[in-house]
Amino acid sequence: MIVVKNLIKIYKIYQKTGRLITDIFFRKYEEVLALDKVSFEIGKNELVAFIGPNGAGKTTTLKILSGILFPTAGYVSVLGFFPFEKKEAFLKQISFIMGQRNQLIPDLTAMDTFLLNKEIYEIDDYQFKKNLQKLTAIFSAEKIIHQPVKMLSLGERMKMEFIAALLHQPRIVFLDEPTIGLDIFSQEAIREFIKDYQKEFKATIILTSHYLEDVKRLAKRLIIINKGKILYDGSLTAILQRFSQIKYVSLILEKKVKQEALFKIGKPIVYQLPKVIFQVEKKELPRIVAYINNKIPYLDLVIEDEKIEEVIKSLFKNQR
Amino acid sequence: MFKKIKRNLKILLLLTYNSLKITSQSRQGMIFFTLGKILRFLLLFGIIFLVFSKTKIIAGWSLKQVIILYLTFNFIDTFSQVLYREVYRFRPLVVSGNLDLILVKPYHPFLRLLLGGVDLFDLLLLLPYLFLLLLFIFQENVSFFSFLLYLVLVVNGLIIATAFHIGVLGFGLLTTEIDNVIMIYRDLLNLGRFPIEIYQQVISLIFTFIIPIGVMITFPVKALFGFLSFKNIVFSFFISFFLLWLSVKLWQIGLKRYQSAGG
């Protein structure tokens, strides 16, 4: 469905020197490598999350996949089309929702934009009514579609943006920071909506977000990108197996234990008796568990993975 | 093909209807805007009469010919403003990044960026201009062929205006500083209210061959009175289609180099 091979994007950024004559007649441009030989494939009905720090290349990738930007080099095919050609048959099958951009007309009602999109995407009356009913029902937004957009709250406006973008039932949906700036209730509503939409319409969804909660709740596959390079492409669970070298061992002691016996496990990161937590190397885990079973009397033993946020953070740190 | 035209017309009608709904929200603004335009039109009309009270001919043009030229200018200027009002709102779209969401829509972006804000109130102003224009033309002794050529050259003038506006959009993709470009276009076009012969020869040549305001406005009126040579008629069509081609190329280059806000 989506094939990207050795994709490169270079931005030319105008460098201001502050000297008037130089800035007018002898402009200097800096070349910024936004994407550096990025390759991946995405299949039908997948929900893939792109994550990375600001300027990592997430949005640039999405903009190239949707045909907004022209790639500097590399191969891009989406639904069999080269996106930049902006063929109608291609554009009718995709949709792009950006958390900080609007397609709704602020002075009019959301319904006015929906009706305009009905003509643009050539949706017949029956299908339009059916889709609108379904989408507004998911959001419980039947009433606000008739209010002027400028009178809506950010969360309500975002819901309307989603409906406007999905009325034509796109096969591929690009979501760029869809929950940015929203309160926790609206974030939750949007997440539920994305999940329901993917299930109902069998769409392929590509999501970028700074909120790991979005990723954890929605995506099975994760693409981590930094400085224009893909650092990881795989499942959420596999990332822990591959990159996490740490486990957390949490103990509730049955009775007082000599400190020396406990410190043989390692220096605890939490020492609030009867609770003790250790951070241990993954490879040391079997030896440590055996030692605890033999030497330490306990009421409860819990072994936990490192948090995904920590794994990703250390991945970015290592790349710096 | 017919289906596509029908669909585009439907979208255009909806965009126009939405634009009308937005404009009608500010009634006072609408009234003052229209009054200002009428006042400007009447003042210039007064100046023409004042000049001709002191002299009978300006650069070989009689009073009625200058009035027809002035009304032709107003018709072309107002008509292009009616159609291409949305171009004046292009910069905010680029700067905010909302242009991205227009580029992913399955229609030609000109439908929205060029024609998406048709101003129906300006269209109303066009009717008295048209009435006065025809009134003055039919008072003159012009042949049917000259009138037909005049109409064709007015359409040709509108093609040049279209090319200018597409060019502004193309510039807008390359640099966001397009407000200046559109103001330069407006200022230059304003010089076309009078026959280009009143300017010095160098300026007159510039207005014919480089910035063809003369071709847009003076040439149709010259053709109406039989002053325009065959060579200049051919040149008029050549320059309009060349400018249209050039502006579309500029737009395409702009799209390729477009970096998108926050990209």
For each feature predicted by the language model, list its residue ranges.
Chain A
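Conserved ABC ATPase "signature" region
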Residues: L20-D23, L115, E119, Y126-I144
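Conserved ABC transporter NBD signature motif
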Residues: G74-E85, A89-L91
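Conserved ABC ATPase signature
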Residues: D107, P148-G155
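Catalytic Walker B motif of ABC-type/P-loop ATPase nucleotide-binding domains
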Residues: V173-E177
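ABC transporter nucleotide-binding domain
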Residues: R191-Q279
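Short, charged/small-residue-rich alpha-helical element at the C-terminal edge
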Residues: Y248-L315, R320
